[in-house]
A protein has these predicted regions:
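N-terminal capping/linker segments that flank leucine-rich repeat
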Residues: 1-26
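Short, intrinsically disordered, charge-balanced linker/junction segments flanking boundaries
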Residues: 7, 75-79
Length: 79
């Protein structure tokens, strides 16, 4: 998944969180290596088994996100 496609998924997820429209992010088993997810609101997102190695997750909201078996090796988790 490229950054532009990921940005669309995040936008729809954030809309789902705000008003129930849009859709919950299902990024399970996605290759998000080195993706920029900084400041993204991923509350409740499905990230099971995702490759997040080297991803920028700084200041992202990961509350209630499912990160089971996700690869976070080298990910930026500041904030």
């Amino acid at each position: 998944m490229n950054q532009a496609e990921l940005d669309v998924v995040i936008e729809k997820h954030e809309k789902w969180l705000r008003d129930g429209h849009g859709e919950r992010a299902n990024l399970s088993y996605a290759n998000l290596r080195r993706a920029n997810l900084s400041y993204a609101d991923l509350n409740g997102a499905d990230l099971r088994g995702a490759n997040l190695s080297g991803a920028n997750l700084s200041y992202a909201n990961l509350r209630r996100a499912n990160l089971s078996y996700a690869d976070l090796n080298g990910a930026d988790l500041r904030g």
